[in-house]
């Protein structure tokens, strides 16, 4: 089987919503987080390696909360995105910089741990099963060509809007062959019934709600790292030292490469509903959406986390059977202290005991 890697950009954990780690907030019935579902769907599609792009200071907590658990199911590697990780000649120029450099640098950080075609996603977005299947199929059968081959999973605009406010989306212009021609970054798109609109004062502009949009789900090959490296140095060179918010962003990079004729970008269509946490209030929407998908059997409510829960449940049931056997065996001289304690706890509140040993 051909190899393909999933790269999850998670260096921004904790930087929004007053320090709340939104990516790690449970959204599934068994405590799953959004990344659980992304990894689960990716493994089902065929991806056999996951690379987490994180900050070094988050490594310990990240591994404890999700990384070590995922590593039991699939090969895991880490790449570290730091503001200071720039060529030495630019260090003094941007000495006051605290804002991350953007998705382009995040991917560039993976160059030493990725040597196969890879799919890039955001840590706090849910993309749906079909998106991973389409991407894996493309990445494991990339045709040879003069230009660098890239793919992008395009989502339907109306399937990506928030009920809680305006969002920024990259609206895509695609030709009749499904090739990307242009990405138009559009701000403050609001959901208005079945419409997608942008309001500026008294002026309201309506957009085709069925337009394909980019949600930062890109399929790339290792040769893209050289392009990113050269482009990042050019970006740093032309960025003013006082511009502490400028970012090296993948959609912008690919847009420029399209104009130069350096790359070809195949747009893979997905009709799946996209879910993400743009606003704090979006979390409840995501929780309900996940529950609905599970009820429709389009999503595993178990994901990766539940495998661990099942193991604990089996261990508990085995201990309970042993205790009951001991109680029936009157010839046994004594019951171990651990089992006596378990028996007393079960007698007081057996349902609580089952619950406590199931998470």
Could you tell me what each predicted segment is?
Residues 2-29, 45:
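Glycine-rich N-terminal loop/short-helix segment of MobA-like nucleotidyltransferase
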Residues 229-262:
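A C-terminal functional module that forms or caps the active site or interfaces directly
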Residues 129-218, 222:
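Conserved core of the sugar-phosphate nucleotidyltransferase
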Residues 264, 274-313:
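Hydrophobic helical membrane-anchoring modules
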Residues 1-8, 32-120, 127-128, 132-134, ...:
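Conserved N-terminal catalytic core of the sugar/cofactor nucleotidyltransferase
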Residues 310-313, 329-331, 345, 349, ...:
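Intrinsic-disorder-associated, low-complexity terminal segments enriched in Asp/Asn/His/Tyr and depleted
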């Amino acid at each position: 089987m051909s190899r393909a890697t999933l790269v999850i950009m998670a260096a921004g954990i904790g930087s929004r919503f007053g320090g709340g780690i939104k990516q790690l907030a449970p959204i599934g019935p068994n405590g799953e987080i959004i990344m659980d579902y992304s990894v689960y769907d990716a493994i089902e599609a065929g991806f056999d390696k996951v690379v987490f792009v994180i900050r070094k200071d988050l490594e310990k907590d990240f591994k404890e909360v999700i990384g070590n658990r995922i590593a039991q199911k699939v090969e895991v590697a880490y790449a570290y995105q730091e503001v200071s990780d720039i060529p030495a000649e630019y260090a003094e120029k941007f000495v006051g910089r605290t804002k991350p450099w953007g998705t382009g640098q995040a991917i560039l950080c993976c160059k030493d741990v990725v040597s196969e075609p890879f799919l890039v996603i955001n840590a706090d977005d849910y993309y749906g099963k079909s998106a991973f299947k389409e991407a894996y199929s493309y990445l494991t059968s990339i045709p040879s060509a003069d230009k660098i081959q890239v793919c992008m999973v395009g989502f339907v605009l109306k399937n990506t809007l928030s009920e809680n406010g305006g969002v920024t989306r990259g609206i895509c212009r695609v030709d009749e062959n499904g090739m990307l021609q242009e990405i138009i970054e559009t701000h403050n798109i609001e959901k208005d019934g079945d419409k997608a609109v942008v309001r500026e004062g008294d002026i309201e502009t309506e957009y085709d709600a069925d337009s394909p949009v980019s949600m930062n789900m890109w399929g790339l090959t290792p040769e893209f790292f050289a392009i990113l490296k050269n482009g990042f140095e050019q970006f740093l060179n032309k960025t003013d030292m006082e511009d502490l918010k400028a970012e090296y962003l993948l959609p912008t990079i690919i847009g420029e490469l399209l104009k130069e004729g350096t790359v070809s970008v195949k747009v893979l269509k997905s009709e799946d509903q996209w879910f993400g946490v743009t606003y704090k209030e979006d979390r409840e929407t995501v929780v309900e959406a996940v529950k609905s998908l599970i009820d429709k059997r389009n999503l595993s409510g178990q994901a990766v986390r539940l495998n661990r829960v099942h193991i604990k449940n089996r261990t508990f049931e085995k201990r309970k059977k042993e205790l009951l056997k001991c109680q029936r065996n009157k010839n046994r001289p004594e019951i171990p202290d651990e089992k006596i304690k378990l028996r007393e706890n079960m007698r007081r509140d057996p349902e609580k005991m089952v619950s406590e040993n199931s998470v």
